[in-house]
A protein has these predicted regions:
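Noncatalytic alpha-helical scaffold of FAD-dependent oxidoreductases
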Residues: 1-259
Length: 259
């Protein structure tokens, strides 16, 4: 099924509930753990949100963007960028993963240290519950203590508690400067010590910290030989760190404090 609106999703869910037919929500199909694969038994309805792909509104002054569940993550990023804002969720499949799937799996991405998981980037949700009832929870408020906060049950539930149809997403100011560095470390324990040092000295400037093993670098060299490697031979353990700052800060000088 390819619904184009929340009302159509509600109609489909209501009909399936009455007929006792299961539903498998489908986003961009980028998950690699089989979450979008139906179990053996009676065939369920595959419900794709790909036609619900509108960015409904961007409230630049509030740092909020309202997107339907079928919007591709890269399109959310582009809509924010057009307003000189940042939607900081970034991952390898951002060109095909959809925001509903990101929310349903509580995706982390590369900037989770600074901005948090997808859960931390969501202010409100619109969803269709198993009965077909529509949950209208597209709040744009940072501070909202009215009633039960059902979005946190739905985020990460992989469609088992309801089908997310739209979300109010939290935007951030775009960093003026971004600095990156690649460092060789002796072990994962040494990487943790480096991360602790970086956060002690640079605080919220640390936006990314990835520990890579030699095997991963070797795979990259084997399958993408055109990618230039920073080392003649890959070290056993490597850390890639990213820091961001406002215009007044120098990211290179900040990174040099770690050496």
């Amino acid at each position: 099924a390819l619904p184009r609106s929340t009302a159509e999703v509600s109609t489909l869910v209501t009909a399936c509930a009455q007929a006792r037919v299961g539903i498998v929500p489908f986003g961009g199909g980028t998950g690699l753990v089989g979450g979008q694969v139906a179990e053996d038994g009676p065939k369920p309805l595959i419900l794709s949100l790909e036609k619900m792909n509108a960015v409904r509104e961007v409230y630049a002054e509030e740092n909020v963007l309202i997107a339907e569940a079928g919007v591709i993550l890269a399109d959310v990023q582009a809509a924010a960028d057009a307003q000189n804002r940042l939607f900081p969720l970034s991952l390898a499949a951002e060109g095909s993963a959809r925001i509903g799937g990101n929310l349903a799996t509580n995706a982390g991405g590369t900037s989770v240290l600074r901005y948090g998981n997808t859960r931390d980037l969501c202010l409100g949700l619109e969803a269709v519950m198993p009965s077909g009832e529509i949950l209208n929870g597209l709040s744009r408020l940072r501070k909202n203590n009215t009633g039960y906060d059902l979005r946190h049950l739905l985020i990460g539930s992989e469609g088992t508690l309801g089908i997310i149809t739209a979300a109010a997403l939290k935007l951030s100011p775009k960093p003026a400067k971004i600095g990156t560095a690649m460092l060789v470390v002796e072990s994962p324990k040494a990487a943790l010590s480096l991360l602790s040092l970086a956060r002690d000295q640079l605080g919220e400037m640390v936006s990314g910290f990835e520990l890579m093993h030699k095997q991963g670098i070797d795979f990259l060299t084997q399958y993408m030989p055109e990618v230039r490697q920073p080392f003649d031979a890959a070290p056993e353990w490597t850390v890639l760190i990213e820091v961001v700052s406002p215009a007044a800060m120098n990211t290179q000088s900040a990174l040099e404090t770690l050496f």
